[in-house]
Amino acid sequence: LKATEGLRLDAFFVMPSCVPSTGLDESGAVLGPEDIKPYYENPRVLGLAEVMNSVGVVAGQEDLMGKLTEAGRRGKVIDGHAPFLRGNELNAYVCSGVWSDHECSDAEEALEKLGRGQWIMIREGTAARNLEALMPLFEAPYYERCMLVTDDKHPGDLISMGHIDYIIRRAVSLGADPIRAIKMGTFNAARYFGLKDRGAVMPGLRADLAVLEDLKDIRVAAVYKDGVLTAKEGVCLGAGKEKKRNYAAGEEPRSGSREDTESAEKTAGGLETAFPRVFDSFHMDEVALEDLVLEQKGAMERVIQFKPHELLTEERLVPWQNTPGLAPGVSLEQDIVKAAVFERHLHTGHKGLGFVGGYGLKKGAVATSVAHDSHNLIVVGTNDRDMVLAANAVRKNRGGLAVAAEGQVIGELALPIGGVMSRLSVEEVEEQLQALKVLTRQLGISSDIDAFMTLAFVSLPVIPKLRINTYGVIDVDRQKQVPPSF
């Protein structure tokens, strides 16, 4: 909150509602109702973030109900997260005070939730792309209670494609009325969050304006904040060095300058002194080969099957695989690789092992500490040796991404701030991220799969069907641990 004061944009927040996400997740902290309550006194805290433990809400879990009751009592917005929740369970969820949902993957589900009085956030991000399936919501009367969101989006996508402006462009290209699409990306969102002083061009509202070249390409020519020209032709104006952002311009992102790097390092050095815990969030032993031993318990193995452009997974049951030179259970022919998640906040030594399918990896390993929502260390690979190397590279960097193959680390991106953020400029991060993506393609990962964003969601036990975290493989619908081999 303090870091976003005095910027040339207004930053608002909603408080995390589920830390950890469910009882079958392991985070670095636990936030209860009393931990959240004081922040509501800040006018820039608008409400409660996505209530993802829908099973707990429907069951009337005490701590969750306490958070919902407090937010509701204060008239705060309560965001939802309830994929596939229908019927009486949806009724119970809505009765608990949840206002919205951003997890709809088809129009039928969205229309049922609209019919229960919820708002629908139409999501189009890097990994989850639901816009095309939800285009019927751009028709009257549905569009009046819908808005546009990205959920997670890689920095490179923000630079090259844009943010909400990209979703508007994409919707218009799919046949949406441009005025409706713009309204869903501006006024509707402001109305939902209770920001009555902005969101439209009219007397009495704040002069926060985006000037477009036309209503077809939705290209932003200029931006005004509080009536003052703040950006023009992709260049941020005003105090400090002017910095061009090539979002939505179709240009290749440039790498950051030496001055950018030195400035970032100087700033991060001061922050590291002020907030040592944020820069020292990795508390785990080195990963060893014996940590990856997954014993065969039966003739079958359970695979977490990825779906292109979706966060949803499927359960796939196949005979146990044995291929010389690969980890037990792994099969390149069947597109099955091993997955492991290691707790890294509190030095518990907890881990979960399993298998994922549809990732496309043909050799080597990929590791990341960007793993929603607890952000433990996750690694997938075809063999244990490369998995150990990739995992330990992330640990050594105190967070980040790493790729290993044929016995060596071939690429890495350090994210030492909480294990999820970089000291570098967005251009430098994107340059390194693209280099890593090239490596993952060389290792076989399909262009239909975002190698890192896909892994970032595979450990979140609130999106069906299967996930993997430090508890092991989780059946989300049943909120139950299930064996990877049986």
Name the predicted role of every residue range:
Residues 159-175, 179-486:
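Active-site microenvironment of metallo-dependent hydrolases
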Residues 46-185, 190-200, 209, 213-214, ...:
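Active-site core of metal-dependent hydrolases
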Residues 1-75, 141, 410-413:
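Divalent-metal coordination cores built from histidine and acidic residues
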